[in-house]
């Protein structure tokens, strides 16, 4: 018997990697729930249910009927709408809900205070799921750190085209990150061992490294020296908060770099939580190998 999974937000930054991992495994039947206005293209053999952009409960319940698992990969702007999806999953008789938690450890109070619109709202969704688990809806939340191949140039401080790095403090604090393909594999494998992954957070990574480790790998893989600016992390945080106070969104990636790369804000989650890599059969990779694959595209 196949496991029936419906993915919400499959056209986004992460969704198609999860769909691909599931679709490549004959043990799963994949369906997609998409917004009516979505322009995303999906494989022709996958059933797509389109609903109003605000996810009306009646429409969503109908789409969820017969599904074993709902996986949500909705964007930050739709995080709170997951409560409607959760209620619909319960009414449709779905067995498990995986929320769009993928990223930093949102339980960290320091990070939530800094970017509540990203972290606090995600945590509230998991708490909503906790309250529903006695009603028969299991959940699994993934802490992955940033998606490495996206974040490395986006906000982690490495300009690949100019071969220049911006390093916070001495660059020695270690943090964890995961590639999107590994996230997809982790989600798929978690559904194959439901008794070990029910009603809990799963902490995974592709690499755990410091900014200095990444810089060393980039120098090695490109064969060039790279320019470096070492900057004060607290000053960067102050500037980022000032940007946000004036409505400048550039402050968000600056704070995400701080949260990731400065100890105590949850980027170092594998220092205080047990890795789920082994139970999820995730591949072991070193920093050089991962950076080389990112540079190859």
Swiss-Prot record:
MF annotations from Gene Ontology: oxidoreductase activity
Origin superkingdom: Eukaryota
Pfam families (UniProt xref): NmrA (PF05368)
Keywords: NADP, Oxidoreductase
Top EC class, one word: oxidoreductase
Protein EC: 1.3.1.-
Pathway: Secondary metabolite biosynthesis
InterPro entries on file: NAD(P)-bd_dom_sf, NmrA-like, NmrA/Isoflavone_reductase-like, PCBER-like
PANTHER family: NMRA-LIKE DOMAIN-CONTAINING PROTEIN-RELATED, NMRA-LIKE FAMILY PROTEIN
Function: Oxidoreductase; part of the gene cluster that mediates the biosynthesis of the asperipin-2a, a bicyclic peptide that possesses two macrocyclic ether rings consisting of 14- and 17-membered paracyclophans. The pathway starts with the processing of the precursor aprA by kexin proteases to produce 11 identical copies of the hexapeptide Phe-Tyr-Tyr-Thr-Gly-Tyr. Macrocyclization of asperipin-2a may accompany an alpha-hydroxylation-dehydration sequence to give an imine, which is readily hydrolyzed to yield putative ketone intermediate.
Entry similarity comment: Belongs to the NmrA-type oxidoreductase family. Isoflavone reductase subfamily.
Full protein name: Oxidoreductase aprR
């Amino acid at each position: 018997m196949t496991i029936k999974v419906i993915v919400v937000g499959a056209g986004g930054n992460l969704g198609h990697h999860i769909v691909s991992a599931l679709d490549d495994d004959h043990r799963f039947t994949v369906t997609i729930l998409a917004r009516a206005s979505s322009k995303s293209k999906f494989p022709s053999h996958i059933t797509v249910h389109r609903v109003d952009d605000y996810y009306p409960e009646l429409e969503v319940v109908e789409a969820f009927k017969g599904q074993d698992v709902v996986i949500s990969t909705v964007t930050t702007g739709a995080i709170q709408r997951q409560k409607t999806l959760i209620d619909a999953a319960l009414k449709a008789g779905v067995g498990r809900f995986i929320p769009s938690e993928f990223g930093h450890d949102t339980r960290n109070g320091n990070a939530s205070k800094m970017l509540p619109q990203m972290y606090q709202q995600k945590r509230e969704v998991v708490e909503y799921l906790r309250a529903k688990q006695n009603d028969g809806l299991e959940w699994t939340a993934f802490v992955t750190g940033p998606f490495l191949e996206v974040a490395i140039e986006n906000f982690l401080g490495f300009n690949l085209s100019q071969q220049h790095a911006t390093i916070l403090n001495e660059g020695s604090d270690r943090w964890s990150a995961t590639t999107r393909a590994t996230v997809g594999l982790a989600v798929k494998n978690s559904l194959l061992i439901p008794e070990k992954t029910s009603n809990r957070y799963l902490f995974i990574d592709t690499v755990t490294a410091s900014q200095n480790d990444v810089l060393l790998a980039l120098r090695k893989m490109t064969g060039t020296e790279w320019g470096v600016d070492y900057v004060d992390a607290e000053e960067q945080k102050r500037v980022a908060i000032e940007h946000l106070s004036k409505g400048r969104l550039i402050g968000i990636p600056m704070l995400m770099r701080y949260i990731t790369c400065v100890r105590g804000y949850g980027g170092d989650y594998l220092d205080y939580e047990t890795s789920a890599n082994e139970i999820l059969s995730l591949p072991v990779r070193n920093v050089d190998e991962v950076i080389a694959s990112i540079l190859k595209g």
